Amino acid sequence: YIGIIPARYSSTRLPGKPLAMIGDKPMIQHVCERASRALPEVWVATDDHRIADAVTAFGGSVMMTSPDHRTGTDRCAEVAMKIAGEDDVIINIQGDMPFISPESIKLLCDCFSDPLTDIATLAAPFARAEDMQVRHKVKVLVEDDGWVYNFSRTPLKKGTAGMDDPEDWMAKNFKHIGLYGYRYETLMRITKLPQSQSELAESLEQLRWLANGYRIKCAIIPEDTISVDTPEDLLKAIQSNKDNTH
């Protein structure tokens, strides 16, 4: 298993967020340290020298990538081509999840004990029913055997039976957490696929993979993890870090 953390400096809502300080460390260092407790090899993939310099300064492994990638998956594929072998599983870890637990990453890896798993991801129960109506909280409908049925920005149902009650919706819809694992060959193939109509409509690259028949296994973790997208999220992360270090 090889962990790759795609990290961009330019973010519309929070520029330079991988270098945002949480306590006495930049966010990217928090992510690297947690990933390294779960995986034998972890790399940061970036197109920005400021991020590369910061990673080198704390002793992390970093690789410069093309600035032209559309997605973090594409950035991962560029690095994987240089460092991974055909039997490797690549774990794509979001650089804006400073408190991702090593246990969650290990659960993601465990999905590959099933030889039918092409891709794996994580999800958590929604804390509140009203959160299911928030578009940026991506929903994933997970079958009882752990296979993903679909992803959407709106609540999902499979057929119409037994989904009248909000409790039923909550039982089937989980909050998607954007970590992915891919078998090496799968990663090489999915990054060459043309964008699907469903992907373009929802701005969710994982819909391209489902549309092309790739099987995605989803591990359920007990609760969501903080994702830093806005200045408000960063303040929450700083406070959470304080609460957990005292």
Predicted features, each with a name:
Residues E41, S61, G213-K217:
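Residue-level detector of anion-binding/catalytic polar loops
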Residues Y1-T46:
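N-terminal glycine-rich phosphate-binding loop and ensuing alpha1 helix
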Residues I100-L193:
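Conserved core of the sugar-phosphate nucleotidyltransferase
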Residues E167-H246:
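Conserved alpha/beta core of the MobA/IspD/sugar-nucleotide pyrophosphorylase nucleotidyltransferase superfamily
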Residues T46-D47, I100, Y182, D229:
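A conserved hydrophobic position in a structured secondary element of the catalytic/binding core
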Residues L39, G85-D87, P115-D118, Y214:
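Short, high-confidence coil segments that cap the C-terminus of an alpha-helix
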Residues W43, H49-L107:
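Short phosphate-binding loop-to-helix
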